Regions:
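N-terminal intrinsically disordered, low-complexity segments enriched in P/E/S/T
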Residues: 1-232, 236-259
Length: 259
């Protein structure tokens, strides 16, 4: 099928939609529910911008992310469930985890980092994995400061990583030396080709010669999208549209116009 194809990697999922998409899925499949994204609703716990750092370090200490604002970074990245279809993209602002680690006097052999939420939830990750991906302690999502019922709140985000590791309401970070570096869960192969029709209508009629625009977003967590393919005859033939230059850390936002 002939047509015009366009793509970029721009755009974000509005915060209310992020909660609607992940609010229930995250409970069972990803990290804890992101209640702090919902305007007017409170999250559980007593999280603030103060985070306690401990583990296998010479001296425990606390940091206030507000005092590290000059080191903050802004990134746009995908948040994607490992065992479900939901995913979204957000513009986040936060302090690099590396900046906090640099402040710690590590003991020999430290290879693991675990961020704990106010409810005690935490997922161990290889320290080098997080540093290589420029993990952020995020305090702003899509221009909105994160809040808990007691004040400011922080979340752990990192590119090309499933959302179960995006711990909410972070209050403690442990840097530890483990005998075995923890494995990192990747996306379930069943969900690599995530397809969801977000908008549809019954009884639509398109007349010959009318211009029709199809649009959507695509993500293959940890791998760049190489092409979007279309079929208008039940899969007998396919039109391949390359997405040259697309990177793995963001979704592909595409449009295909035909008549």
């Amino acid at each position: 099928k002939e047509g015009a194809f366009f793509f970029n990697q721009d755009g974000v999922t509005p915060n209310d939609e992020l909660f609607n998409v992940f609010g229930t899925a995250i409970t069972s499949m990803c990290s804890k529910p992101a209640n702090e994204l919902v305007v007017g609703e409170s999250a559980e716990g007593a999280a603030t911008y103060y985070i306690n750092i401990g583990g296998n370090i010479k001296e425990n200490f606390s940091v206030n992310l507000e005092d590290m604002e000059e080191e903050s970074e802004e990134q746009t990245m995908v948040c994607s469930c490992a065992t479900g279809a939901p995913f979204g993209q957000a513009a986040v602002v936060g302090v690099p985890l590396a900046a906090v680690v640099d402040m710690a006097n590590l003991e020999d052999g430290v290879n693991t980092v675990t961020a704990y939420g106010a409810d005690g939830f935490g997922q161990a990750l290889p320290l080098q994995y997080c540093l290589d991906r420029d993990a952020l302690l995020v305090y702003e999502v899509n221009g909105e400061k994160l809040k808990s019922e007691t004040g400011p709140s922080a979340q752990l985000w990192m590119p090309e990583t499933v959302a179960r590791y995006f711990t909410r309401n972070v209050v403690d970070i442990k840097l530890t030396a483990e005998e075995q570096v923890p494995d990192v869960q990747s996306v379930d192969p069943t969900y690599r080709n995530k397809i969801e029709i977000m908008n549809s209508a019954d009884g639509c009629v398109f007349f010959a010669g009318n211009s029709i625009t199809f649009e959507g977003v695509a993500d293959d967590l940890g791998s760049p999208i190489e092409a979007i393919e279309f079929s208008f005859d039940g899969g007998e033939t396919w039109t391949e549209c390359p997405t040259e230059g697309a990177t793995a850390d963001k979704w592909v936002n595409w449009q295909f116009e035909t008549s």
